UniProtKB/Swiss-Prot annotation:
It comes from Caenorhabditis elegans. The keyword Signal does not apply. One of its GO terms (biological process) is protein ubiquitination. Pathway: Protein modification; protein ubiquitination. The gene is vhl-1. This is von Hippel-Lindau tumor suppressor homolog. Gene3D superfamilies: von Hippel-Lindau disease tumour suppressor, beta domain (2.60.40.780). InterPro entries: VHL_beta_dom (IPR024053), VHL_beta_dom_sf (IPR037140), VHL_sf (IPR036208), VHL_tumour_suppress_b/a_dom (IPR022772). GO terms for cellular component: Cul2-RING ubiquitin ligase complex; nucleus; VCB complex.
Length: 174
């Protein structure tokens, strides 16, 4: 897309995975400040997203994780990227002192989108079989973008549907 609304390489999830170098447990609270539900994912060592939960607006999720375990959040409806502490990927950091137990707060917020992206994503609320007729009057480039959004929504739905409830991040081997 020419306007930069597709961030990074256009993938739903970054090409990142967890490592097992640090076994210090880190407590995190994800708080949804978006106007819509979001899904919270841990990126496992195989670089696969593992869904930990869906947060309604103003709800939170408490988890235990480890350093070098990346976390991301996506809008539940279509997989649109949102920010975690103003970043696309959250990397937990342990407390500064070993004996101090602290829960890190991670605020999930909306990303700024162009009007073009907002308009294109508005078609995602329609029945997918009706969208081709609804976008016929749009410029060809916009039609391709809407089709791309529909493909990403389908891909996201498949990822979420195959997610198995997690056993929890595994403690690194010593």
């Amino acid at each position: 897309m020419s306007d930069g609304s597709m961030d990074d390489d256009g993938r739903l999830f970054p090409d990142l995975g967890s490592s097992t170098h640090d076994n210090r447990e880190i407590r995190v609270r994800f708080l949804n400040r978006c106007a819509y539900p979001v899904d919270v994912f841990w990126l496992n060592p195989s670089k696969q997203p593992t869904k930990y939960g869906t947060l309604a607006q103003k709800k939170y999720l408490d988890i235990k994780t480890f350093k070098d375990h990346p976390w991301v959040a996506r809008r539940s409806f279509d997989g649109c990227k949102v920010l975690v502490n103003e970043k696309e990927v959250f990397w937990p950091e342990p407390a500064p002192r070993m004996n101090l137990i602290v829960r890190n707060h991670c605020v999930i917020t909306m990303k700024v989108q162009s009007l073009r992206e907002i308009a294109g994503r508005s078609f995602l609320r329609h029945n997918p079989t009706e969208v081709p007729n609804k976008i016929k009057g749009l410029p060809r480039e916009l039609q391709f973008e809407v089709k791309h959004f529909l493909d990403r929504k389908q891909e996201y739905s498949e990822i979420v549907c195959r997610s198995i409830p997690p056993p929890g991040p595994q403690r690194p081997q010593q």
